[in-house]
């Protein structure tokens, strides 16, 4: 959510930043709506003040036996009492109209974010490692998983429809091992506190992190309302419950940075991805992810962003996976983001659009959101000046467990179709070194 006062003071800068995202200028329309709102509030307050003053004057007129004046004042007060609820409602409608307009506008990109219309405008930041070489043609994860008998899309479709999978035996265990490994590193070495959050959240929580109202079609609604009339939603990412833990609160600066992590199922309708990645586990309605969330001060949020990226990278390094980090351009970064790094892991079995073997696939996005989400959540901290200020929020995948499973399968595949277990995962697998078909 944007600060309308900042927009009033900086209309040209606001429109220029929107232009970098490929959007039309909106400052003038927002300022005009805000002027209407402020005018309605001022008129209501003036009428309220006049009612109070006239009520006081009635007593004075009666005391002075000025009956005609007292009658006129009582008539005026009666008229104001009738008008005031209407004026208050009009002011509140304009307040809500402005809020709705602001809620539809994405965050403003930082100055250093590269400009571009889509993913083709993203800029490579750095690369880690080299792709492995194989004495055979690497298979994709679907062929590997089905060959082992541990990955079943057909039975999943009978249960739940398209974009679901049933994992079993060695692959189910491997996915669990990856998630536990990620959590152990982030909590044991990176200073994140593990949280086990609800998987159902209310409208307010989804609004706070900016999934609602703009991306309603991409979410799974639970189809029921709570006692206050709010809807329930399956979480699309643990970012939602973790970030909303500080909603409507004022933290002490000593509590910051607050670093939280969770391993949860995530649920996405993928309405905007129809026809994309329909084969395999790349894009699922249900998947597992380790999420990283940081709540910090404005002065520290940029440093925290770099730190979060390094934490996400570290777990991939220990898995021995080759990847690259991309700085997303203005046309490709998320709605709530000021700046985003994507980590794209190399998957040797994937076939690119050019028909070549091997391609990079996103496995993590790390974003700094400034105070954009904090304003929607009313999340603040009290600094040395003893005044409340909005916190800055950051979120990142640490990382997507399903895609990490794919990367491990394709990277560590052997010619006979078995999967070598990375050294760091073997303790989580009871010492198992190779995943083979059950005999």
UniProtKB/Swiss-Prot annotation:
Q: What is its main location?
A: cytoplasm
Quote the cellular component terms of the Gene Ontology held in the record: cytoplasm
Free-text function comment from the UniProt entry: Catalyzes the attachment of serine to tRNA(Ser). Is also able to aminoacylate tRNA(Sec) with serine, to form the misacylated tRNA L-seryl-tRNA(Sec), which will be further converted into selenocysteinyl-tRNA(Sec).
The GO terms this record gives for MF are: ATP binding; serine-tRNA ligase activity
Q: Which UniProt keywords apply?
A: Aminoacyl-tRNA synthetase, ATP-binding, Cytoplasm, Ligase, Nucleotide-binding, Protein biosynthesis
Q: Which Gene3D superfamilies is this protein grouped with?
A: Bira Bifunctional Protein, Domain 2, Serine-tRNA synthetase, tRNA binding domain
**Where found?**
Cytoplasm
Q: In which pathway does it act?
A: Aminoacyl-tRNA biosynthesis; selenocysteinyl-tRNA(Sec) biosynthesis; L-seryl-tRNA(Sec) from L-serine and tRNA(Sec): step 1/1
Q: ATP-binding among the record's keywords?
A: yes
Origin, by domain of life?
Bacteria
Q: Which residues bind L-serine?
A: 237-239, 291, 397
Q: Which reaction does this chain catalyze?
A: tRNA(Ser) + L-serine + ATP = L-seryl-tRNA(Ser) + AMP + diphosphate + H(+); tRNA(Sec) + L-serine + ATP = L-seryl-tRNA(Sec) + AMP + diphosphate + H(+)
Gene source species = Afipia carboxidovorans (strain ATCC 49405 / DSM 1227 / KCTC 32145 / OM5) (Oligotropha carboxidovorans)
Name the record gives this protein: Serine--tRNA ligase
């Amino acid at each position: 959510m944007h600060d309308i006062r900042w927009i009033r003071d900086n209309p040209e800068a606001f429109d220029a930043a929107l232009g970098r995202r490929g959007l039309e200028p909106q400052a003038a329309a927002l300022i005009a709506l805000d002027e209407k709102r402020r005018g309605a509030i001022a008129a209501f307050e003036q009428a309220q003040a006049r009612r109070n003053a006239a009520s006081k004057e009635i007593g004075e007129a009666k005391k002075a036996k000025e009956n005609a004046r007292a009658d006129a004042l009582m008539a005026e007060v009666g008229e104001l009492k009738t008008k005031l609820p209407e004026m208050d409602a009009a002011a509140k409608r304009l307040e809500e109209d402005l809020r709705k307009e602001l809620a539809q506008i994405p965050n403003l990109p930082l100055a250093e974010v590269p400009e571009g219309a889509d993913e083709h405008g993203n800029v490579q930041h750095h690369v880690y490692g080299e792709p492995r070489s194989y004495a055979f043609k690497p298979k994709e994860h679907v062929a590997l998983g089905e060959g082992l008998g541990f990955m079943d899309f057909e039975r999943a479709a009978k249960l739940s429809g398209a974009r679901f999978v049933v994992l079993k035996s060695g692959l189910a265990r491997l996915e669990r091992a990856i998630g536990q490994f990620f959590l152990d590193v982030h909590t044991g070495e990176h200073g994140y506190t593990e949280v086990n959050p609800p998987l159902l959240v209310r409208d307010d929580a989804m609004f706070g992190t900016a999934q609602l109202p703009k991306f309603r079609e991409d979410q799974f609604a639970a189809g029921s309302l709570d006692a206050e009339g709010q809807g329930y939603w399956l979480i699309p990412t643990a970012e939602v419950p973790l970030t909303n833990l500080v909603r409507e609160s004022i933290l002490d600066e000593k509590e910051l940075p607050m670093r939280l992590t969770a391993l949860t199922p995530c649920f996405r309708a993928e309405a905007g991805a129809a026809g994309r990645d329909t084969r395999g586990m790349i894009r699922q309605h249900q998947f597992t992810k380790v999420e990283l969330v940081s709540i910090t001060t404005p002065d520290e949020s940029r440093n925290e962003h770099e730190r979060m990226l390094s934490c996400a990278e570290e777990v991939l390094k220990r898995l021995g996976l080759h990847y690259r980090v991309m700085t997303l351009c203005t046309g490709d970064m998320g709605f709530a983001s000021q700046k985003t790094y994507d980590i794209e892991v190399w998957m040797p079995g994937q076939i690119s659009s050019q028909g070549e073997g091997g391609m990079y696939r996103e496995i993590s996005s790390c974003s700094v959101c400034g105070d954009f989400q904090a304003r929607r959540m009313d999340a603040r901290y009290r600094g040395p000046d003893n005044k409340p200020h909005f916190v800055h929020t950051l979120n990142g995948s640490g990382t997507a467990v399903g895609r990490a499973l794919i990367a491990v399968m394709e990277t560590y595949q052997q010619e006979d179709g078995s999967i070598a277990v990375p050294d760091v995962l073997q303790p989580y697998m009871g010492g198992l070194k190779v995943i083979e078909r059950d005999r």
